[in-house]
Structure formats: structure tokens, C-alpha cells
Amino acid sequence: MRAPAVRLNIVHLQNQQNTEPTNLNNKMEDFFMNRIGLICRYLKENPHSSQRDLAQKMELSLGTVNTLIKECMNLHYIAPGKSIAGTYELTCEGETFLNQFKVDGALILAAGFGSRFVPLTFETPKGLLEVFGERMIERQIRQLREAGVENITIAVGYLKEKFEYLIDKYNVTLLYNPEYSCKNTLATIYHARKALYGKNMYILSSDNWLRENMFHKYECGAWYASTYMEGKTSEWVLSYNKKGRITDVTVGGENAWVMYGPVYFSREFSAEFLPELEKEYETPGTEQFYWENVLIHHFDRFEIDINRQPANQIYEFENLEELRRFDSRYQTRSNNEALELIAKVFRVPESEIHDLRCLKSGMTNKSFLFQIDGKSYICRIPGPGTGLLINRREEAEVYRTIQPLGISDRLIYISGDTGYKISRYYDGARNSEAFNWNDMRACMKVLHQLHESGLTVDHSFDIRERILFYERLCLQHGGIPFEDYQNVRAQMIELLDQLDSMNRPKVLSHIDANADNFLILKDGSVRLIDWEYAGMCDPLIDLSMAGIYSYYKEEDLEKLMEIYFGRIPDNTERLVVYSYVALGGFLWSLWAVYKASLGEEFGEYTIIQYRYAKAYYRKVKERYCLQGI
């Protein structure tokens, strides 16, 4: 009903400021209605405020605030204060007008891993870490509730079960992002989009820490929080116009306002923004996009303001060392088993463990890099359930046995009980390359040194026993999915019986001598790492396992055998290697099926290993005399 009056007075305001033409479009009206909404909100939150109070809180000139107040008075949204002269209070009409700006809820992004916070995030999602005794996500939930925002959705993924308790404690909703491990926050917003459409919503990061409560029951227009960074910064730097509207974003800058912390989506903003986000989600090559990438690509279409925050209000901890500087408790006690162990082994306080960095996780373990006194080390943490699959006491025995050879990683500590291992990190080292035959020559020399060392341990790697072991595990955890499994299993038994009849020699073997487990040091020397499966076995199994891990074709395997033997292999040697290729493929396919039943996924690895079992059984059957055929 009162739109014409709004239009006339807004035109007057713009003429006064000489910033926009008099023929205002709807977006300009929205801009000023948002400012009127802010006047109403501030008066609701702070009754009996003066013009000067409002100008200070809104960071506007007294003249602009005076014009906005006149507009609010004309619309009957505010009235002069009854008890204190020179102040204003919200009317019933103002309350009704303000309702359109009511915040409907908040979406908290908590799906990611937090790789820069290892080893803490191996056990605990980053948002559940405590700062001054309070978990970061719980602090934000508490602040939201204090502001009157009750409807809270948490987008989860990594260690999602850790957030379940929040349902009972705060009556939140958990929303699962199935792509958390392979895509970035664009995908998280995509999967949560139904919670955003048609609503006024905060978008928060679970791992932010906010000093003061910056949330409100009412928000007027979309915004992105910003903090001023002095000096050079690698954050996303904002450009904005005199109205506070963001006009551009660049990566990195100096002495600038940057994207930092909470965001607010109005329902109008979401109606325009989310369809474009859906398009980008469907576009190949956007898998690692942040949701902000969509905003950056289309600033000409979306209207979102900067919400400048004071210094020391918003904290986004980049790593554990930043958190240590902020919360001194982490300097001495992190309540993390790995860091406590390192401190004990090196006899230093946790504060001297620094430059922590996540290393690429293997198929069974998690590892991270750290420094003490300028030297780099690796700490290995056994993966979930590996205690059932790997005998850590036997692994420790192997490491003690091979130390005189000088072919393994330099061991600092290993526990036969927990499986934790600490070793030196070789700066400048690289993994060998499976198809670099010069690398393979160097690696095979190390294998020869191991096989011919005469060293022994008290345990064996019995591939028959291991196959039956993993078969039982699979049958206990959902079964084995291969349609022809029983037939292939019978073929593997034939190969096992054939090998047993040959009375093959048993020496200390690595079992997992794949290219990734050979390190080429800067001086060209080679180290063989990860001895979890090592034991007494036929030495040729190491060639077979190396081949199937690297997805070798037959000609590649032939080349590897020639390098190892220093000649063309004879038929018996080839038969043995091929047999172990089949058996190794069968074993690791069962291993992968079992791991998949626990929620881990290895893509095509399972099928490739199963194909090795079938293909190399046929090669043995067709080319060599297999007993019983």
C-alpha cells in the first residue's frame, strides 16, 4: 500500500547523495528497503536509540540516517520515544514490516576433513575441536540460539557419526554430503540447496570461532562477513562500492578487506544464486570449486554486501600452530594420542612439534609429517580395523631384524601393541616410478639384498591362510559379490596345491614391494618402506605383488623378471611368478571387498585385482603343466 511513498522519498535521498539516477529499478528499492529494515532492527534490539546511535551502528552519515528515519516515520514504522527525548522506538507496523527479514535458520558446513589440522582431525572433525574449552561448532550453535535462530542444519560428511550427539543436545538436523571426500563446498551447498530455497539463512563454517555474537533474529539483505588484513594476504580480497555492495574478488592482495567468516543468504538472493550454482555443479571441471567461485563468476548478476567486522572478531584457524598461539592449552596438551606419543619419544613439550602436514593416506594407514629441532619425521597411525588384519608385533620384529641391512626407513620408534611408528623423513626423496626401468633396476637390487641376506623371522606369510582369512571376513560382512567366485576359488586352490608341491624356498620377503614403497633418495640410494606384511615366504612373490600393484601388463612383468634375475627367466620361475600374480590378485580383491563392507572404497582396484586372478590362472593353465589338468 505504501510503495509510492517509499519510491518518492527514496528518489529524494538519492538526489541528495548524487549517487544514482532518479529512475530507480526494483533492486535499488530493495537496497533502501533493506536499510529501512536495519533501522527497524536496531530499534527493536536497542529501544530508545538516537539518530547518532543509529548512525554509529550502521556506519552511515547523520544526514543519511536522518533521511531514513523520516522515511520510517512516514511509513509509521517508528515513532519518537515516549520516555526519552531525541530517541525513537519501533511501532506495531514496524514489527510487521520487519517480519519479512526474519532469519529462518542456519546451515553449518562441517563435511570436510581439515587436512591442515592433522593429526587432530584423524580422530575429530575440525569443527568439534575445542577452543577455550568449548567446541567451535557448539559455540556458533549457542550464539545462533541466543540470537533467536533455532532451525539449524549441519552438512556432514567426514566422521559424520561424531556429530550425531548434536541432534539430542541442540535439536539440529544433520544433512549428509555423499561427495565430501572428492568435491569441495560447491557440492555441499548443492546437496543442501533444498534447505536454502525460499528461506533467509546463515551459511557458516563449523570451524570458525566468533568472539562476539554477530547473529541477529533479523537480517536485511545478503552479505558476506569481512575482516581487514594488514600487509600481504593470500585470502580472497573484496572490492565494494560506497553502498557496501561487493563488486569484485581477487585472490591475494595487501592491506585489504577479505572474505572471512559467516555469510547470509536472503531468500531473494538464493532464488537467483542457487540455480546458477546448480548449473556449475553439473559442469565438468568444477569438482574442486568452493561455492564462492560461483559468486565470483557472476558478480554482475548477484547482489551481496560486505559485512565489515572489527579486528579480532572472526577467527579461521589455518593450522594447529595458529590455534596454539590463540589457545595456549594446545601448546602443552592437545589430548591427541599421536602428539602425546611424539612428545614422550623425543622428550619435548608438544609446542616443539611443529610444521605438521598431512601426507597422502595409504590403503591401510594414516601418516603425517612433523618437525622437531629442524629435522623432519613421519608418524604413522594405523587405520581403523587394521589391528585385525596386521600383526604389529610381527612387523616390529621385522624392523628389528632388517636394521643391519640399512635398506629400510630409519626407524625412531615402533610399537608392537598400537602399531604407531615414527621414522625419519627423507627430504628430497621421491617414490620410485613403476615404468621407469632405471628405477626398477635400483629397486630390484634392494630386493636381492633382502632375499639373499639370510635373515629370518619367526613368522611366515602364508598366502593360502590369508586368502581363507579374508574370505571368512567377507562372508561375515555381507558376502562376496563376484558371480563366479566359487569357480575362481577352485582355480586358486589348484595353484596353491601346485606351488606347495614344488617345495619352493622361503626367505624373508617384503610382500608389498610395490613402486610406492621404494624411496629414491637424493644421493640415488634406495630405501624400502612399509614392512607390515613381511615374513618368510617364496621370494618371487615380491615380483608378483610389485606387478599387480602397478597394473603391469604381461610384457611389463617380463621386463621386471629380467631385471631381477639378470637374465630371461626360465619356465619354472615364470610359472611361479604368474601363479603368485593370480593368487595375489585374488587375495587383494577379497581384501578390498572386506574393506568396502566397512565403508572404504577403492574404485576399480577390486575388479582389476580379480581380473589378475582369472587372467593369470589361464596363462599358467595354457602354457605350463598344471597338475590335475
Language model features with spans:
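Conserved core of the sugar-phosphate nucleotidyltransferase
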Residues: 210-285
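N-terminal glycine-rich phosphate-binding loop and ensuing alpha1 helix
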Residues: 43-44, 58, 93-160
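Conserved beta-loop-beta/alpha segment of the NTase-like Rossmann-fold superfamily
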Residues: 163-236
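ATP/Mg2+ or Mg2+-diphosphate-binding catalytic cores
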Residues: 327, 334, 590-629
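An alpha-helical support segment within catalytic cores of ATP-dependent transferases
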Residues: 337-355, 455-511, 522-523
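Conserved alpha/beta core of the MobA/IspD/sugar-nucleotide pyrophosphorylase nucleotidyltransferase superfamily
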Residues: 44-47, 91-106, 258-344
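Active-site activation/catalytic loop segments of kinase-like enzymes and analogous catalytic loops
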Residues: 540-569, 582-600, 614
